């Protein structure tokens, strides 16, 4: 049997798995125990569902046992009905009505409360995971694809819900039914029941082998589903690039490859699931057949010809023995659900246990002038050194442009200023205070960011501009920010003005319009330090001119750190910092650097883009 199971291939495809970094996987029992602890506050739902299941199963088992007294006492000699047996039959009828009523009540109670428990588990886990994602460091999102993370939030939680609802109720309900049927079998014939116990260890061995196979298959399926989600999300997000570069077939092949692997894993799970029940049924049928031979041979005592097995006990025993196959089958099937849930639980707890963004500071600055000092800053991604000994002094109100070739460390530097990453050496001071000594919330409250790749939300213009502000923002404030960002003119022309939904990531707007909405958002926040990753190289001349005017309006009232790509930006900057290979190689004003004839001169002559 083990060889048959081993033929179901369990090879993994080396796909990305969020829990792949866990060197020692927690044991199934520990994971399941922790899973139940997550919903311990819902114990009353589980208790009521369990009580309902017990009533349901006890009523079912009792009705099977009624076969015994009905056959033994409900009929007179020769199979006829006597006055006494008629009374017994009527009592049995009343008893069956009562048992059916108990069964119905138990069914409703168990299904209602276990369904409620399942929905509460979905709600709790998705809420906890989403809340956790809000506090995870940038390194987490660098390591894991969007599709993988979304798959964990949606698909994995559904798998866990099955374990805490369907699986639990099946274990309790069918487990109770099995116990009840075993009691019926022992009461009907303890001799035959003892014989059936022999099969227990064989079933246990078979199920333990199946458990391991299911767990491996489930883990592979969880991972491959994440890859499918990621590829689909990537395709939808980048549909323009895919079509322009004629990569439809390549992207389709990538998606189909991941889908094929997921399909193969699911088919293997189905095959293993389909194999489990027939094997158990074959074992059980062989035992029942052997029992019949035993009864035929040893069913009577040699002395007086009396039997240790009456017609009623025989019928109730075999009715119970036949009925026990279905709950046993259900209990073996629930193993599939549990193993899927265990694999899903690993990834969910991986996210929930992932170290949050480090909060190293406790200080808070109520007001900031905007002086930024960078001293001997060094940083590396693993073995790859990105910044080395960077020192820059930025006075309040200055506009400092960072220029350099791609990969010179400009964007990484701004990420460290925002503390999305923490430097390995050196320090960054904000008004003389090390940024690591400030709370993350306080530090970031003094910063505004306008990204090269503008990020807008599928919401109204108003909500995008007032995004993140804890105070109430009036329409007048939003309109003022739009005017200063040279955006109010086109917003007025939208169907609902500032209350117009702009689509996914501002898809209903042009590139220049999206830039200006982003600038208006920074204007409304009015932070003393602005980080601007310039992207005007992607705009037409008119849009560039309007965005430049909006940027000038924004930089008048704050310290501005610009990752510059345009000549007009560097020409007007108070200071230019030239970076190469993660180091500052030149620093000064535009004309001074041109006269030096170094890297800046070459970048300037090439247009800086």
Curated annotation (Swiss-Prot):
InterPro entries: AAA+_ATPase, ABC1_TM_dom, ABC1_TM_sf, ABC_transporter-like_ATP-bd, ABC_transporter-like_CS, ABC_transpr_lipidA, P-loop_NTPase, Type_1_exporter. Residues 47-340 form the ABC transmembrane type-1 domain. GO terms for cellular component: plasma membrane. Keywords: ATP-binding, Cell inner membrane, Cell membrane, Lipid transport, Membrane, Nucleotide-binding, Translocase, Transmembrane, Transmembrane helix, Transport. It comes from the Bacteria. Pfam families: ABC_membrane (PF00664), ABC_tran (PF00005). The chain crosses the membrane at residues 47-67, 88-108, 167-187, 190-210, 279-299, 305-325. It is found in: Cell inner membrane. The keyword Transmembrane helix applies. Its main location: membrane. ATP binds at residues 404-411. It catalyses: ATP + H2O + lipid A-core oligosaccharideSide 1 = ADP + phosphate + lipid A-core oligosaccharideSide 2. Residues 372-606 form the ABC transporter domain. GO terms for molecular function: ABC-type transporter activity; ATP binding; ATP hydrolysis activity; ATPase-coupled lipid transmembrane transporter activity. The keyword Transmembrane helix applies. Its EC number is 7.5.2.6. It is a multi-pass membrane protein. In MsbA the ATP-binding domain (NBD) and the transmembrane domain (TMD) are fused. Involved in lipopolysaccharide (LPS) biosynthesis. Translocates lipid A-core from the inner to the outer leaflet of the inner membrane. Transmembrane domains (TMD) form a pore in the inner membrane and the ATP-binding domain (NBD) is responsible for energy generation. Belongs to the ABC transporter superfamily. Lipid exporter (TC 3.A.1.106) family. This is ATP-dependent lipid A-core flippase. It comes from Francisella tularensis subsp. holarctica (strain LVS).
């Amino acid at each position: 049997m083990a060889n048959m199971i081993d033929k179901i291939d369990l090879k993994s495809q080396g796909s990305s798995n969020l829990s792949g970094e866990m060197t020692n996987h927690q044991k199934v029992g520990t994971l399941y125990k922790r899973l139940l602890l997550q919903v311990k506050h819902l114990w009353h739902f589980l208790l009521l569902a369990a009580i309902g299941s017990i009533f349901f199963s006890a009523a079912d088992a009792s009705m099977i046992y009624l076969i015994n007294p009905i056959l033994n006492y409900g009929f007179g000699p020769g199979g006829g009905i006597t006055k006494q047996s008629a009374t017994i039959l009527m009592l049995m009828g009343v008893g069956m009505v009562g048992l059916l009523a108990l069964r119905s009540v138990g069914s409703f109670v168990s299904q209602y409360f276990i369904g409620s428990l399942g929905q509460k588990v979905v709600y709790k886990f998705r809420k906890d995971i989403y809340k956790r994602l809000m506090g995870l460091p940038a390194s987490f999102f660098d390591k894991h694809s969007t599709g993988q993370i979304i798959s964990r939030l949606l698909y994995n939680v559904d798998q866990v819900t099955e374990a805490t609802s369907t699986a639990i109720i099946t274990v309790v309900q069918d487990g109770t039914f099995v116990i009840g049927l075993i009691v019926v079998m022992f009461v009907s014939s303890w001799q035959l029941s003892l014989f059936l116990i022999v099969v227990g260890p064989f079933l246990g061995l078979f199920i333990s082998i199946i458990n391991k196979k299911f767990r491996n298959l489930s883990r592979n399926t969880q991972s491959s589903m994440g890859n499918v989600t990621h590829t689909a999300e990537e395709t939808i997000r980048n549909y323009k690039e895919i079509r322009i570069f004629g990569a439809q077939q390549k992207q389709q092949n990538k998606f189909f490859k991941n889908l094929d692997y997921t399909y193969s894993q699911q088919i293997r799970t189905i095959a293993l699931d389909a194999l489990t029940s027939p094997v158990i049924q074959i074992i059980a049928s062989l035992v029942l057949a052997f029992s019949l031979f035993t009864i035929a041979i040893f069913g009577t005592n040699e002395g007086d010809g009396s039997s240790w097995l009456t017609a009623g006990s025989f019928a109730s025993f075999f009715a119970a023995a036949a009925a026990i196959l279905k709950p046993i089958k259900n209990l073996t099937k629930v193993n599939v659900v549990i193993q899927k849930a265990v694999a899903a639980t690993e990834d969910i707890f991986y996210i929930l246990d992932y170290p949050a963004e480090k909060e190293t500071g406790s200080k808070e600055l109520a007001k900031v002038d905007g002086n930024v000092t960078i001293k001997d800053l060094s940083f590396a991604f693993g073995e790859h050194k990105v910044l080395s000994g960077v020192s820059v002094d930025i006075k309040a109100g200055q506009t400092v442009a960072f220029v350099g070739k791609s990969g010179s460390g400009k964007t990484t530097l701004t990420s460290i200023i925002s503390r999305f990453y923490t430097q390995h050496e050196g320090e960054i001071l904000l008004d003389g205070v090390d940024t690591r000594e400030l709370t993350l919330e306080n530090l970031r409250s003094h910063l505004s960011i306008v990204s090269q790749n503008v990020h807008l939300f599928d919401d109204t213009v108003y909500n995008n501009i007032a995004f993140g502000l804890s105070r109430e923002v009036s329409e007048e404030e939003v309109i003022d920010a739009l005017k200063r960002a040279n955006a109010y003119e086109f917003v007025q022309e939208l169907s609902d003005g500032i209350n117009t939904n702009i689509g996914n990531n501002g898809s209903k707007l042009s590139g220049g319009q999206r830039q200006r909405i982003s600038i208006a958002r920074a204007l409304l926040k009015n932070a003393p330090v602005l980080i601007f990753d310039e992207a005007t190289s992607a705009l037409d001349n008119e849009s560039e001119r309007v965005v430049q005017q909006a940027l000038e309006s924004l930089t008048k009232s704050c310290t501005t750190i610009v990752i510059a790509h345009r000549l007009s930006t560097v020409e007007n900057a108070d200071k230019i910092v030239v970076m190469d290979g993660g180091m500052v190689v030149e620093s000064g004003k535009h004309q001074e650097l041109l006269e030096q004839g170094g890297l800046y001169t070459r970048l300037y002559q090439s247009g800086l883009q």
